[in-house]
Amino acid sequence: CSEADTMPSILRVNGRRRLEGEVRAAGAKNAALPMMAAAILADEPVLLAGVPHLLDVDTMGRILRELGIEVLWDEDDTVQLRTIDARPVRAPYRLLRRMRAGFCVLGPLLARRGEAVVALPGGCAIGPRPVDLHLAGLKSLGAEIELRHGYVVARARQLRGATIRMAGPDGPTVTGTANVLSAA
């Protein structure tokens, strides 16, 4: 029996004062990053609301700018993403080394531009998390994948649908699933 099985379904807090007011819930970085990367796929501007202003989100914005995406913020944690140059296909190591989620641009670049040159992601405090499932999933869709000097070079004339299992010996990969789904 796990701890979750023994927890009550209702948690009641009895305090001395009645709570009143409003709480603004921030958006989730781990949801925002793959959505920002997926904006590469769009013909029209993409608006994402509730995107938290965090270092990783800023880094993703910098990666997208390198890939020809205009990134505009408003005062309400809304970001507008719009393709202004559909030619760049290279996501540089100097930015991807800062966060693993930058690797999420691989699938959208491949699907949209037919080619992607994306640096292998940098280190992680959690430990090694390989991208083999990302690459296997993209190969299942018809991509040609090469590893060259620390970069993944992916090409596809036309991706095709496939049944793919996005789990390996260490379990499923959320980022890999987002990457492959955005290419499909």
Please annotate each region the language model reported.
Residues 1-184:
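Structural preference for solvent-exposed beta-strand-turn elements
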